[in-house]
Amino acid sequence: MRAVGSEKQAVRDTAAWADTVVLAVPFGAIDEVVRTAGDALAGKTVVDVTNALDDKMNLALGYTTSGAEELQKKLPGARVVKAFNTVFAQHMDSGHLDGEPLTAFAAGDDAAAKAEVLALEREIGFDAVDAGPLRNARLLEPLGYLNIQLGYGLKMGTDSGFRLMHH
């Protein structure tokens, strides 16, 4: 695993080096990252962790598309998977809250890429849930927005998360 700063050469080098790229940048920075990484992302699994929020912290896209789908259009050679956007950062290392696993969703059109991300979610400790095709990112992004609104807007804090109960 390699963390990348904001230097353009570091972004290009890391994109070329990695098999899987986790895109955890502000939504407004996606175009610059795509331009900077260029074709180095072709053939890679790109995990879109972004939340499609505008500068005023409102949902930037509706239910006719998603940030992940728009990213896939910009990176036609990549295998985009929407994941981790519904989880606050402090829970990323264990996937748990108070000893209970949080749910992490993964939506994508490439079965192998999605299986890779689901395996990573399970390895971290999340209850990994296949959320279907990439178009279901249209539902995951508003869920991430709800989490942000509960945590920050309604001041419930970030020591919270979602858990899907199923049999």
What are these regions (language model features)?
Residues 8, 80-81, 128:
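Generic structural signal for residues in well-ordered beta-strands
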Residues 42, 50-97:
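Rossmann-fold NAD(P)-binding glycine/threonine-rich loop
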Residues 3-5, 57-61, 127:
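Structural/interface elements that position substrates and couple domains in central-metabolism enzymes
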Residues 39, 73, 119-122:
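Solvent-exposed polar/charged
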Residues 5-45, 51-55:
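Rossmann-like NAD(P)-binding element
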Residues 26-29, 86-87, 110-111:
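Short beta->alpha connector loops
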Residues 102-167:
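Active-site-lining helix/loop region of Rossmann-like oxidoreductase modules
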